[in-house]
């Protein structure tokens, strides 16, 4: 779990920096997926970061659509860990949502509000203190590992 938390924390720092740069330019950031493959005999894992395109005029993708896209990708690439970051708008304003999921069952969720004033991002305190276990709550990344948990723990 500590290794996944380290991956997730570094990914989140990168995404926050990208959001800040995008706001300075007056643009948006698409949902981002990072796939991690750990190879036997290699000191470092392989990281692939993908932007998930959002069709113009849609404003965003539903969790079901995102889950389906990620599930199909994960079925082909079989990652050891997936990290997802996306922005969402709530009644209280903008939030950064992040999820982390590995093939051994580690699941973590993050939500952090932020405001944009004159193209400057001010980050609020993370909801629930930061990374947390989502419990029985379904996450977007769960579909990417459907059926793989039992095989990974044998």
Task: Identify the residue ranges that each predicted region occupies.
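Low-complexity intrinsically disordered segments
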Residues: 65-154
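N-terminal domain-onset segments
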Residues: 1-64
């Amino acid at each position: 779990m500590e290794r996944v938390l380290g991956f997730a924390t570094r990914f989140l720092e990168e995404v926050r920096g990208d959001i800040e740069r995008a706001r300075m330019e007056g643009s948006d950031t698409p949902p981002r997926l990072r796939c991690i493959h750990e190879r036997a005999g290699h000191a470092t894992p392989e990281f692939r970061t993908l932007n998930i395109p959002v069709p113009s005029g849609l404003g965003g993708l539903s969790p079901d659509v995102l889950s389906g896209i990620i599930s199909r990708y994960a079925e082909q690439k079989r990652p050891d860990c997936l990290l997802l970051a996306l922005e969402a708008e709530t009644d209280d304003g903008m939030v950064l949502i992040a999820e982390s999921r590995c093939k051994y069952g580690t699941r973590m969720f993050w939500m952090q509000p932020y405001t944009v004033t004159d193209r400057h991002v001010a980050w609020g305190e993370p909801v629930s203190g930061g990374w947390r276990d989502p419990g029985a709550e379904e996450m977007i990344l769960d579909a990417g590992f459907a059926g793989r948990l039992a095989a990974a723990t044998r």
